[in-house]
Amino acid sequence: MPHTAKILLLGSGELGREFVISAKRLGAYVVACDAYAAAPAMQVADASEVLSMLDADALRAVVAKHHPDYVVPEIEAIRTEVLAEIEADGFNVVPSAYATQMTMNRDAIRDLAAQELGITTSRYRYAKNLEEVRAAAEFTGYPCVIKPVMSSSGKGQSTVRSADKLEEAWDYAVANMRGDRKRVIVEQFIDFDYEITLLTVRHKDGITFCPPIGHRQERGDYRESWQPATMSKPAIAAAQEMAEKVVTALQGNGKGFGLFGVEFFVKGEEVIFSELSPRPHDTGMVTSVSQNLSEFDLHARAIMGLHVPSEILARPSASAVILAEQESETVSYSGLAAAMEGGADIRIFGKPNTRPYRRMGVALATGGDTDYARTAAVAAANKLHIHYGD
């Protein structure tokens, strides 16, 4: 099939689905991979492969089979040493094998930011057992946040306000770890005024920043996001300076092109680095309606060496997540018409089954200001009902 580029997508969730749509609009041929069949991105891709991204041999085999122009990781749990191997063989790993290695583990990216780049972060320590957790919490003070160095969507994260809750938090983190590293980060709880995601695009002509995205989390996972977030010019400048430092440092041996989701806490005028994702960010779903080029469009353009504007503008918009409440092998929906009556847009991700707190869709709304858009998005999300079982 004629195409402008061949992309191997490693991970096929809802963010991957939107990326596939953006890439295909630019003429790309996309092979979507995941550990289960009919994952969201597979439903819109040209071809698909089912494999574990933690199976090194399977990962090598799928790259050899398809020989892509770009290898695009969409998840954290990948054998990054294989990505380094294939990058050394001449494959273009997005944004680089080094970036995927560093950001797969919270300890690696935190140490890079705090120790090598001198970027402001919360106080933190690492722990491999409960005894070390107790010592780390004494160092950070209470409350503190405990989370696995490797997990996704906030799984395993908890806020601890007293020493008698440390064992429970450790057990929860261990139960939700990904990969084979039994290690957590214990960090100072920042009593922030708000938190933001700064979408940062590194492309052939330099770096482009999107307007800041505000977001609200529960259980360590995003529930709402809105753009543009109200933020002072000095605070925006500080966030941009830190984001540029980190994404530039992650180039490694690759091109380092793509979109990064850089998270910050903001307290007054102080901006504190939190985390970074070298791919489209879940809070950035709002850009599907807020920006003329969504985060997925920007990621595809940057990867493929296409033009990315130097300035991105956003109209007041918001997103609200639609969550499953229970486990079921079958799922259906009702209330779509009612959810869209107020002008909101609904994106159903097409996941084949449910479990508690699994993201099944998102409501998107625009308005005269972000408060109006947030209210509209939440109202729309509440009108879409998930049905479990036959």
UniProtKB/Swiss-Prot annotation:
GO terms for cellular component: cytosol. It is an enzyme of class 6 (ligase). Pathway: Purine metabolism; IMP biosynthesis via de novo pathway; N(2)-formyl-N(1)-(5-phospho-D-ribosyl)glycinamide from N(1)-(5-phospho-D-ribosyl)glycinamide (formate route): step 1/1. Residues 111-304 form the ATP-grasp domain. GO terms for molecular function: ATP binding; magnesium ion binding; phosphoribosylglycinamide formyltransferase 2 activity; phosphoribosylglycinamide formyltransferase activity. It catalyses: N(1)-(5-phospho-beta-D-ribosyl)glycinamide + formate + ATP = N(2)-formyl-N(1)-(5-phospho-beta-D-ribosyl)glycinamide + ADP + phosphate + H(+). Keywords: ATP-binding, Ligase, Magnesium, Metal-binding, Nucleotide-binding, Purine biosynthesis. Pfam families: ATP-grasp, PurT_C, RS_preATP-grasp-like. SUPFAM superfamilies: Glutathione synthetase ATP-binding domain-like (SSF56059), PreATP-grasp domain (SSF52440), Rudiment single hybrid motif (SSF51246). InterPro entries: ATP-grasp, ATP-grasp_carboxylate-amine, ATP_grasp_subdomain_1, PreATP-grasp_dom_sf, PurT, PurT/PurK_preATP-grasp, PurT_C, Rudment_hybrid_motif. N(1)-(5-phospho-beta-D-ribosyl)glycinamide binds at E14, L15, E74, D282, K351, R358, R359. Its EC number is 6.3.1.21. PANTHER family: FORMATE-DEPENDENT PHOSPHORIBOSYLGLYCINAMIDE FORMYLTRANSFERASE. Belongs to the PurK/PurT family. Homodimer. This is Formate-dependent phosphoribosylglycinamide formyltransferase.
